[in-house]
Structure formats: structure tokens, C-alpha cells
Amino acid sequence: MNIFNQLKQDIIAASRQLYNNQEIANIVTIETSKDNFNGDLSSNIAMIIAAKENMPPRTVALKFKEILITLPYIASIEIAGPGFINFTIKAESWQIAIKNILQHEGKFFEIDIDKNKYINIEYVSANPTGPMHIGHARGAVYGDVLARILQKVGYNVTKEYYVNDAGSQINDLVSTVLLRYREALGEKITIPVGLYPGEYLIPVGQILVKEYGNKLLVMDEEERFKIVKNFAVEKMLDLNRKDLEELGIKHDLFFSEQSLHDKGKIEEIVKLLTNMGLIYEGTLPAPKGKIHAKWDNRVQKLFKSTKYGDSQDRPIEKADGSWSYFASDLAYAKDKIDRGANHLIYVLGADHSGYVKRIEAIVKALGKEQIKVDVKICQLVNFIENGVPVKMSKRLGNFASVQDVNHEVGKDIIRFMMLTRQNDKPLDFDLVKVKEQSRENPIFYVQYAHVRTVSILSKAMELMPESYSSFEAGIYDLSLLSSEEEIDIIKLLAAWTKTLEVSAKYFEPHRIALYLINLASKFHSIWNFGKENSDYRFVIENNKELTTARLALAKAIQKVIASGFEVIGVEPMNKM
């Protein structure tokens, strides 16, 4: 029995019995109380019904109390504030969560959620102009773990990387690679400001020399550009793929922006929107703070995005007549929808916060009100080494690459640490701190908890084989787990699937990391109590029954930590 789902279903049943209400399943909530003074769980059902029935919330709450107090797992019910219903759950109903985790793992981790969604989640999408810096890793980990969570709760998910291979930065990449090519042929070169001075492009120039000799120098400029562009983008994309794979990240699809141009997808969407009266020729006001004398107030083709809540209409052509980046966005969104997605999630960097309304406008303009759009912004990572901030810039050639940091600390540390703060808050990544073996290092703290559970079970197998055999056979008395600390950690274990559900609902993977830190903290507290008071130890040589029950608790903690690590993409450690 999942106590959260069970209580929700019983509340829904009571609502139908009292008010014949058939529509509350998706709006009733079950929350964990913040302290033991307000029970274990609470619900807003009375206020929902009161608003619909035009009744005082407390009156409604009392009616629910009369029915729900008869449930076998409810110890008491209190009505608080304007009509919150607070439930205290019987200890044995919490304790059974241990049995469910150990013996019915599949059912315990099953989540009751609407699964009729086909989600396309786009993340990373770093320009293929060089190695990925550590700032990209945050969006990469956030997107990857969010996709894992959504898949775990049952959604169909496509993980996508949008390859920006058609913009001005690609032109700069080609120019830089051509200079490195000339350098490989023996010329002395200088990399102009605005290009990419990093040494990572030197091997690309050298490979071009091996394949083409000096033929590129005498080749038609257009043909040379095409060859070098395709070659450079492929090499940089291979570099990015490798960086991502070393972080444990694999996309289902790498989608080329250039393919939208080559296949006429942009012309197709522009024609469609023009026929709908959503493309017009006009001018845009100068940006705030812009010197108007320098503002290009030209007539251009604009998309009526303000009709759908955007702050201004968006140009679909550049001054030179080529398609704008936004025009590609239009075609790309339509392509995703045409492929069957009914929920689009975009994971973007802090410099793309203005894209939220634009993307929503695109989908609405396509007449796809049923398509849900979410844009999640990942704030900056402040990378620190020995207390000194490290500036990150491909163009300056001095940035902390994902590869460098991965080789320094490992993928597991990067993945976990990137989730220790909510995605829309800045994150400090301290290279020294993440390698410390202390409570101040969250990943170490959780891994150490897993290691200790392994140690407990190994010690019991050696010192108390009879207790261990009983535990292995599933013969244990969970009612012996009755201390306040034990019940407290069991409640947290029971809330694991609820944490997954909420993380999926609000697109907040950081909840998983924080949950694991909290679980580890409670476990370490019990362990430390055992150092001072032998009654709190997991293995008590003169108490077979209690030891057997606590082995079950230790194993349940181990399984939930491992489940959390699986979602985050971290390998649990068995020894340190």
C-alpha cells in the first residue's frame, strides 16, 4: 500500500459519496505536514469542495472527517485553519512501507499519474563551435534527469539536441578552422578578435591537411566553405557527443537546424502563417536604451507574436534577406508537433529567458492549444577553483570544459552537484569542496549512507547469521521499529514515490537530490545515536528480533538511495 495514493483514493471516494463529485481526481492534493504537531499528511479537499458547493470549508471538512476517521490506517484527524484536514497515520501503516519496498518493489515505485503524453524535451543544444564548458553541464544534467523522471513515471519521452549549424557563429567557426588549416600548411597566422582562439581547433586544421593537402586553397570559395563547414560541425558535434556521453547523457535525436533550410521547412511554415494573416511587413520600435539614430528602422517581415502574449512581434528575416533564427524556431516547433509530440519542453540557458513567450506564441499560432509548452531556464554556474572564479568563454579560449572537470572530479559528482539547487537559481560549483569527504559535501554524504547500509548487512551476515537469514527470508517484525527516529525515517522512505511524482509534475529534479540528502541525514543521525547508545545500533548481538527488523530498515534505505541515484544517473558506492 502506498499511503499517499491510498489516502487520495479514499478522499476521492468520500467526495463522490458526499457530493457526487466526479471531477476532483486531478486537483485534490496530499501533502506531507511540515511538523508532527499538524499530523502526518494534509489535504485541501474541503476548500475545493466548499468553493464548488458554496459551503463553509470547515463544515465540509467535518463531513469528510466523519467518513475518513473510520479508515483502518487513520489514527486521528484534525481540522486546521480555514479547512485543511490533517491526518495522523497509524505507526503500523507507515511500517508496512518497509515490506512494500523490499517485497513489492515494483508496485511500491508505481505512480498513479496521467500517462497519455508524448513529451519532446530539448536540452543542451550547445552551438557546435567547440568543447562544452561546465556551464552547459547544468542544462545537460537538468534535462537528462528530468527526462529520466518523466520516463520513470510512465510518460513517452524523446530527448532531443537541436544542432545550431546554420547561424553566424558557424561562419566564424569556418573562418577559424580555415586559419588553422593554413597554419597546418606552415603559414603563420593570427586569430582575429571575434573568432575562436582555443587550441582545440588545431587538430581539425591538421586533419583537413591530411585529407585535402593544399587543395582547399585553390578551391571555389562556396565549395570550400561547404566542405569546411560540414567537416568542422561534424568534428565539434562528435566532441560534444563524447563530452555528453562521459556525463552519462545520450540523446535520442540530434536535429540539424540546417536541415530545416535544406528541406524547405521554413518556407513551408512562413507560407502557412502568411495565409493565416500572421506574417506582415512592418517596422519594430527601437529597443529601450538604444540610440535611435543608430537603429535600423527598416521595413521587414514580422510574425504577429504579440497576438499571443509576446512583448513584441518577431522578425523572420535578417537584413541580408536570409531567414532569422526565429524563423527556424517556427519551423522546428512545427516539426516536433508533426512528429507526434503533445508536450514540448525547452531547457534553455539564462541568456534565453526572453524566449518563453516567443515559443508559446509559435505553438498557439499553429492552432495547437492542446499542445502544452514549458520553457525551463537554467541559471549560470559559478565555477570556482581554489576560491578564484573561473571565467568561461570559448571566444577567449579560457574556459573550464566539461571534459576537464569530468576528468578532475568524475561524472557522478558533476551530475549530483548540478541538482543541489533549483534550476532557476545560480549555482556555485566549488572544485575543492566537491572532493571533500565531509558532511559539507552532499554527494559524499549520500554515498556514505549507502556504503554504511552495505556495511551493516555485511556485519550482520558475519556476526548474526541467524538474524540475517530471517531478514533474507522476509521474516521480521516491523512493529519493533517504533522509536521516534525510526518512524521518522520510515515516513521519509514512504514519501519516495511522492517525491518522484512531485518532481515530474513541477519539472524539478533538484527535489530528488534534496530528498536523498535528507534521507542520508536522518540515517546518519540514527547511526551516530548508536555510537552513544547501543539500543540504537542496527546490529545488536543480544537482540535477534530487533536486529532482523533493523536489517530490513537498512536494506529499504539502501534500495531507495539506489533508486534515487538511478534517476540522477549516479552509481551507488558499496565501499569507500
Swiss-Prot record:
GO terms for cellular component: cytoplasm. It comes from the Bacteria. Disulfide bonds: none annotated. PROSITE patterns: AA_TRNA_LIGASE_I (PS00178). GO terms for molecular function: arginine-tRNA ligase activity; ATP binding. Its EC number is 6.1.1.19. The keyword Cytoplasm applies. GO terms for biological process: arginyl-tRNA aminoacylation. CDD domains: ArgRS_core (cd00671). It is an enzyme of class 6 (ligase). It catalyses: tRNA(Arg) + L-arginine + ATP = L-arginyl-tRNA(Arg) + AMP + diphosphate. Keywords: Aminoacyl-tRNA synthetase, ATP-binding, Cytoplasm, Ligase, Nucleotide-binding, Protein biosynthesis. Monomer. Belongs to the class-I aminoacyl-tRNA synthetase family. HAMAP family: Arg_tRNA_synth. NCBIfam families: argS. This is Arginine--tRNA ligase.
